[in-house]
């Protein structure tokens, strides 16, 4: 059991140095904080999927995937002729 505690301490040290040690925990300053951030982000995505339905969630992902630092996903979709059905964004 001591090795588990040592491993967690090592992860905590890395987290304090700014390294992400838990997937989805970016920005947390400890292992525990990163775990909470990751859990909240996951739950937020699940809630959004429930609100929009699977098709709306997929369409929104398509639009978001087209966004860049220079232009929004909607602008790029219009420029490139990609069809995004925004009527699916509401359930």
Curated annotation (Swiss-Prot):
PROSITE patterns noted in UniProt: SMALL_HYDR_PLANT_SEED
One family name in Pfam for this protein: LEA_5
Keywords assigned by UniProt, alphabetized: Stress response
Basic and acidic residues composition bias: residue spans: 1-19, 32-51
Induction: By abscisic acid (ABA) and osmotic stress.
Function (record text): LEA proteins are late embryonic proteins abundant in higher plant seed embryos. They may play an essential role in seed survival and in controlling water exchanges during seed desiccation and imbibition.
Protein name, UniProt field: Late embryogenesis abundant protein EMB564
Organism the protein comes from: Zea mays (Maize)
């Amino acid at each position: 059991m001591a090795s588990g505690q040592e491993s967690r301490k090592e992860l905590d040290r890395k987290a304090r140095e700014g390294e992400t040690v838990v997937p989805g925990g970016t920005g947390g300053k400890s292992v525990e904080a990163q775990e909470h951030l990751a859990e909240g982000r996951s739950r937020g995505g699940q809630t959004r999927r429930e609100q929009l339905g699977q098709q709306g969630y997929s369409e929104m992902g398509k639009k978001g995937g087209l966004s860049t630092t220079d232009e929004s996903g909607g602008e790029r979709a219009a420029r490139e002729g990609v069809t995004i059905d925004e009527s699916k964004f509401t359930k």
